[in-house]
């Protein structure tokens, strides 16, 4: 029987073989395709990739951060999650208040210049310390703009009100499960210019059939090697959490990607991953005593039977 992880591995192969070379915002360069879809049956295991280790702890803490409506990296740092640091750090080193060493193009330079990387690491550690310990600094430079959490939980209307899209869609699933409007959008054109990183995973829709909850994500832009594995696990986890509250079983996670790309400095890592054989997906267990998705904490989420191949490191394009 075909392993479900091949949905992802086939995406990697397809882009490596048929992708178009493109320049990008980060200056790194990519090969990409436009319009690709993967499907995962969540009843047959939790799709946490096994051909490389994907840190579930980071996936879960980021999702809980989104669900809280938080847009400041302090919560993530408190949970030893550094995946959003570079975007907040960028706003700090580009500000008039920053007086440290030149950090222009720190993403690429830290990969190419060992001496610079020492300076970069020192400045990043200092930045993280200030976000954690200095409220004023955190409020100013730990903030990422109106990113996912804000749009999910407090979408601004032209009337000056706010919409809690996530709470509303959960209520709709309970009351009108056959609705075709079970949608949450993170793409607010008015707010995009002020965001540290405009939403890559832009819109998701739920579908209820035969007592099962399915979710489809439309992702405008997908970093196949680093980002997509997180996105698969994150939205699969979100589907499990909402199904739990609504008294439903889990159905499918359908992942539709607009610009699906592999960065040119990830080719070697992708080839290494493609040479590995998938292992059985793990099982996700939720604390049955927690009834609302908004009450889940890290200790309420457990992954069992996860035996992946080793992690494969790769640089982040900022």
Curated annotation (Swiss-Prot):
According to its UniProt entry, one GO biological process term is: dTMP biosynthetic process
Coiled-coil segments on the chain, per record: none
Q: Which UniProt keywords apply?
A: Cytoplasm, Methyltransferase, Nucleotide biosynthesis, Transferase
- EC class name: transferase
Q: Which family does it belong to?
A: Belongs to the thymidylate synthase family. Bacterial-type ThyA subfamily.
Its function, per the record, reads: Catalyzes the reductive methylation of 2'-deoxyuridine-5'-monophosphate (dUMP) to 2'-deoxythymidine-5'-monophosphate (dTMP) while utilizing 5,10-methylenetetrahydrofolate (mTHF) as the methyl donor and reductant in the reaction, yielding dihydrofolate (DHF) as a by-product. This enzymatic reaction provides an intracellular de novo source of dTMP, an essential precursor for DNA biosynthesis.
- Pathway entry: Pyrimidine metabolism; dTTP biosynthesis
Enzyme Commission designation: 2.1.1.45
Pfam short name (any one): Thymidylat_synt
Q: What is this protein called?
A: Thymidylate synthase
User: Quaternary structure?
Assistant: Homodimer.
- Organism of provenance: Bacillus anthracis
Protein residues bound to (6R)-5,10-methylene-5,6,7,8-tetrahydrofolate: 223, 317
Matches recorded under InterPro entries: Thymidate_synth/dCMP_Mease, Thymidate_synth/dCMP_Mease_dom, Thymidate_synth/dCMP_Mease_sf, Thymidylate_synthase, Thymidylate_synthase_AS
- Where in or outside the cell? Cytoplasm
The cellular component terms of Gene Ontology attached to this UniProt record, alphabetical and capped at eight, are:
cytosol
Keyword match Cytoplasm:
yes
Q: What is its main location?
A: cytoplasm
Q: Does the keyword Secreted apply?
A: no
> What gene name does this entry carry?
thyA
Q: Where does dUMP bind?
A: 25, 180-181, 220-223, 231, 261-263
UniProt cross-references to PROSITE patterns, sorted A to Z:
THYMIDYLATE_SYNTHASE
């Amino acid at each position: 029987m075909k392993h479900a992880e091949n949905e992802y591995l086939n995406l990697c192969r397809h882009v490596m073989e048929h992708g178009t070379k493109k320049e990008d915002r980060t200056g790194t360069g990519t090969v990409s395709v436009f319009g690709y879809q993967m499907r995962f049956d969540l009843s047959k295991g939790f799709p946490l990739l096994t051909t490389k280790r994907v840190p579930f702890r980071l996936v879960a803490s980021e999702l809980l951060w989104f669900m809280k409506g938080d847009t400041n990296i302090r919560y993530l740092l408190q949970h030893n999650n550094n995946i959003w640091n570079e975007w907040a750090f960028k706003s700090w080193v580009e500000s008039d208040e920053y007086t440290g060493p030149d950090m222009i193009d720190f993403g690429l330079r830290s990969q190419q210049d060992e001496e610079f990387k020492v300076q970069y690491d020192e400045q990043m550690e200092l930045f993280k310390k200030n976000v954690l310990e200095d409220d004023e600094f955190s409020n100013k430079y730990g903030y990422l703009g109106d990113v996912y959490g804000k749009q999910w939980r407090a979408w601004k209307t032209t009337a000056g009100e706010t919409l809690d899209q996530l709470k509303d869609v959960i209520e709709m699933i309970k009351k009108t499960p056959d609705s075709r409007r079970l949608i949450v959008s993170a793409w607010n054109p008015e707010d995009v210019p002020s965001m540290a990183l405009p939403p890559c995973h832009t819109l998701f829709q739920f579908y209820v059939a035969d007592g099962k909850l399915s979710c489809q994500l439309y992702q405008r832009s997908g970093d196949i090697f680093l980002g997509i594995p997180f996105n698969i696990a994150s939205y699969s986890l979100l589907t499990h959490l909402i199904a739990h509250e609504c008294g439903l079983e889990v159905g499918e996670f359908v992942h539709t990607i607009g610009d699906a790309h592999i960065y040119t400095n990830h080719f070697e890592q992708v080839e290494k991953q493609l040479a590995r054989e998938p292992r059985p997906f793990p099982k996700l267990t939720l604390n049955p005593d927690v009834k609302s998705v908004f009450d889940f904490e890290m200790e309420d989420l457990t992954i069992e039977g996860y035996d992946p191949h080793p992690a494969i490191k790769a640089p982040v394009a900022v």
